[in-house]
Every structure is written in C-alpha cells, then in structure tokens.
Amino acid sequence: MMKSKEIIDRNLSEGREYIPEFEAYAICEEFGIPHPGYQFVKTMEEGTRAAEALGYPVVVKIVSPDVIHKSDVGGVIVGIESKEAFTAAYEELMRNVKEKAGEVTIDGVLVQKAMPKGVEVATGGLRNDQFGPVVMFGSGGILIEVFKDVAFRLAPLDKEEAKRQIEDTKASEILKGVRGAAPSDMDGVAELIVNTGRLVSELSEIDEIDFNPVMAYPTGCCVVDARIIVKKRV
C-alpha cells in the first residue's frame, strides 16, 4: 500500500485530485485489481516501442490533468494493429485534443493492450459523508447511465456479500450467460468488488473510484478504464 500512498500524496501535493490513469493502474496492482498491460510514454518513438512490447492490438489514451473525459475530446483511439497504424493514431490523438480541448497540458500518452470483448460491467466506490466508504456494482459502458442498473454496499465487504450485490442488478442475468453465451466468472467479479471495497476503505484520501467498463470473461475479468479521484482529508 506504500506505493499507492506515495502516488496519492504526490498528486495532492501537485494540486491534482484526478490520478492519471497509468498511476491508477499502479494502485490497482497493489490491491489485486486486474487491468491490461500498459506503458506511459512521452513521445511517439517511445510509444511505438511500447506497442511492440505489449503486442498489437493496442489502445492509446491521452494523459492530461485538464482532460477528465477523454472520449469527449477524441482522446481515446482503439483497434491499433500495426506500427503504421500506431503512428497515424498518435498524430490523430494529439490533433483531436488540440482541436477539441484547446491549450491543455499534455503529460503524455497511455499505451494499453487491447482486451477481447467480454460482458461489460462496472464497479467503483466513493466516500459518503454519512455512511463512509461505499462500493458500487452495475451494468457497464453507457448502460450504467441509461438504465441506472447499480447496487451499493458499505465497504469493506466479503465475497459472499459481493455476490449478493451482483444479484441485486440486471447485469447478473447477463453474467450467468444468455442466448447460448458462456457464463462469466462470477467469483472473479465478486473478488474485484471486494478489492475495490478494500481500496476505497483503506485509502482515506480516495473520494471516488470509477472502473468502467470492466470486461468479464468465462475465466477472470479486467478493468479497461480506470478513474480515481482523491481529496485531502483534514
């Protein structure tokens, strides 16, 4: 947990409440939260080496303290399958952000291994003034906003309670397998919820966590987009 504390303290000391995604993944590592392979780079040359090391296909995401919702400014490009495509995507990424976000600080680019499609779910957490740390689970992607398919629990929680939380959502039916699809790894998703609960309860500076989407597979699951917001506690 020392590395997570160092990341949070450094960002707060620099006046940043939004943890860069590559550092959010480093925090995830300490709490047993699965995520794709990734590298943070500052130049196109570093990026092409990172993509080769990770293996195509890859995704690129802008890393900027001024850009929270990356997709809104064209700050995410997926499905990059070659060195030539990477070069074009890197240039497009920079062009998009400059055109749509204006003069913003760009720290670099996150190069991330593209993950196979799975059942999209979401988990997260927040620190409530009345109840303390709370963990959320629900349908992933835009469905969480459209259908409000979410369930909440106080954190920390054990795996059995996490499974009951899953059952409280419509997402549980999809995870069990529909129209001949293989069932997803319910134990793996429950473990992710437990570890997300540990994260929000053990690190008091955490204000909000948003892991969306999470890809659930027949074996295991993977957080493919991570947002962590922190605040100084008096």
Give, region by region, the residue ranges found by the protein language model.
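ATP-dependent carboxylate/acyl-activation modules
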Residues: 1-234
